[in-house]
């Protein structure tokens, strides 16, 4: 993407940011699983779901929220509050809204070029939830 085509995250809806953030988290989890675990594709997918489901993202957001900057917290809340009445099959409305807010934050960080911050937050959650760390 050239400079003139850059996306300004402030112009995107919270749900568009969450759409991007969902992909960011999924890619980070998949990459880490492939790097550190020799599993079949089916098992890799099952492990990925443990990190990217709405319930998992709710737990992850709860862990990371104390680390959010003021701006990050505002973006998270914007995403959480934009989440409508629809909910994931296996998540409460609270979990679904928080996971949408978390995805919104990841999308915002990614599109703002704050990849180091994305990786910093991911490392914190990975250390907490990686099954090999237990």
Where are these regions (language model features)?
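Double-stranded RNA-binding/processing signature
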Residues: 1-134
